[in-house]
């Protein structure tokens, strides 16, 4: 529920309770006291009507699932406000005699004020219920946000791990290239060593043959 709506609602309930008391006392007053009381009642009705309009604007700007419940409450408040307007007209008319005032005080106003009190009681219960519902919705939203944040964190971790694996793969690929180059170098060195062995062997053979030939030549002479 909107905090603005709750604030206007509390103010309206306070004004409504005050108007009920003033309407009750106004019926038994006369002269200037009655005029003063009636002026205060009219001012209170105007203030209450302004609060109802503000609540209406607040409710219509809320999501549909919350707005529908608040509009039901607003109908109750408007009905309560209309009761006060009716009482203002009756008090203003000044045509009620003492007996009529007593009957109205004992019957009409008692019924009206009782109905208003019952309406306020039901509305306050509805307000508490909506407040609890709003709290549950807020808790659900908070849980969803926490879940989303956890999901984002997990995705970021997975992305980081993927980048690490890609870098490791690139490193291994570089190692494979170096190993391949090393193999080629070793193969080339091995071939050169083999060629050198044959060359050295040939040289040694030639030297041995030369020595043998020289010895043979000296011995035969």
Curated annotation (Swiss-Prot):
Cellular compartments per GO CC = early endosome membrane; endosome membrane; Golgi apparatus; plant-type vacuole membrane
The effect of disrupting this gene, in the record's words, is: Abnormal cell wall organization in root hair and root epidermal cells, probably due to altered endosomal trafficking, and leading to short and branched root hairs. Mislocalization of SYP41 in root hair cells.
Topological type in the membrane: Single-pass type IV membrane protein
Sorted alphabetically, the keyword list is: Coiled coil, Endosome, Membrane, Protein transport, Transmembrane, Transmembrane helix, Transport, Vacuole
- Provide the coiled-coil residue spans: 32-93
What is its subcellular localisation?
Vacuole membrane; Prevacuolar compartment membrane; Endosome membrane; Early endosome membrane
Q: Where are the transmembrane segments?
A: 199-219
Instruction: Give GO terms for biological process.
Output: intracellular protein transport; plant-type cell wall organization; positive regulation of protein transport; root hair cell development; vesicle-mediated transport
In the UniProt record, does the keyword Calcium occur?
A: no
Please indicate the ranges of residues that lie on the Vesicular side: 220-221
Q: Does the keyword Phosphoprotein apply?
A: no
Q: What is its main location?
A: membrane
Gene Ontology molecular function: SNAP receptor activity
Q: Which family does it belong to?
A: Belongs to the VTI1 family.
What binding partners and quaternary form does the record give?
Forms SNARE complexes with t-SNAREs.
Q: What is this protein called?
A: Vesicle transport v-SNARE 13
State the taxonomy lineage: Eukaryota, Viridiplantae, Streptophyta, Embryophyta, Tracheophyta
């Amino acid at each position: 529920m909107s905090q603005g709506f709750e604030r206007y609602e509390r103010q309206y309930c306070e004004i409504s309770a005050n108007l009920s008391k003033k309407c009750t006392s106004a019926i038994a007053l006369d002269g200037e006291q009655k005029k003063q009381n009636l002026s205060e009642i009219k001012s209170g009705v105007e203030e209450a009507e302004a609060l109802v309009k503000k609540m209406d604007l607040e409710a219509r700007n809320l999501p549909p699932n919350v707005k529908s419940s608040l509009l039901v409450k607003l109908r109750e408040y408007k009905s309560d406000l209309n009761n006060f307007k009716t009482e203002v007209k009756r008090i203003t008319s000044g045509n009620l005699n003492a007996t009529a005032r007593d009957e109205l005080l004992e019957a009409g106003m008692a019924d009206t004020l009782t109905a208003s009190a019952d309406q306020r009681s039901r509305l306050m219960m509805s307000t508490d219920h909506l407040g609890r519902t709003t709290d549950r919705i807020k808790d659900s939203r908070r849980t969803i946000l926490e879940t989303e944040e956890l999901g984002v964190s997990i995705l970021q971790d997975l992305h980081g791990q993927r980048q690490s694996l890609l870098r490791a793969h690139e490193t291994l690929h570089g190692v494979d290239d170096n190993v391949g180059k090393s193999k080629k170098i070793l193969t080339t060195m091995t071939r050169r060593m083999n060629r050198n062995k044959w060359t050295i062997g040939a040289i040694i053979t030639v030297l041995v043959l030369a020595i043998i030939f020289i010895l043979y030549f000296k011995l035969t002479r």
